[in-house]
Amino acid sequence: AVMTVKYTNTWSSYSTEKQAAKELVDEDCVVISQHSDTVGPAAICENAQRDIPVYHVGYNQSMTDIAPTRSLVSCCVDYSSYFEQSVYALLHDKKIEECIDGRTYKQDAMAGIDKGWVRILDINEAIVPKGTKEMVEDTIEKIEKGKLEVFSGPFTGVSVFDRNDKINLNTPYKENANSS
């Protein structure tokens, strides 16, 4: 499988996101996962007129109402834990990084599904194969118990910005490990 990336350089431009999704459909993409906030890509997937369906993975809101026959799953970032822990730090005159229940790298903080910072919003059981929900729940449990790294596996690639920048996830990638 090949992953193609299109950058919109915005979180919330319906027309730009639709255009990027349409380009992916025209390039014979079979699954579009978005990391922007409008329903544009889901609408493009739902309305794509071709023999092979174009499925969709949503971000920050359920897309099932927009793409009932194409939206597989949606997830969201849940900042509530970060905000609660940050406010606690401020009220107790502590550094935020000392109070975060997650990984911190200098001034960057992050956590995933294991800490509740990322959540699955819905799985469209009307279109996914039987047993998908249970498989997702099992995968989440493995992540929560530290038995599965999200950014790891037999995947390699090349950066779209620098062809000399090779990506190899046979060794797990720690996001933002070298930031700040």
Regions found by a protein language model. Name each.
Residues 1-180:
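A residue-level marker of the well-folded mature domains of exported/periplasmic proteins
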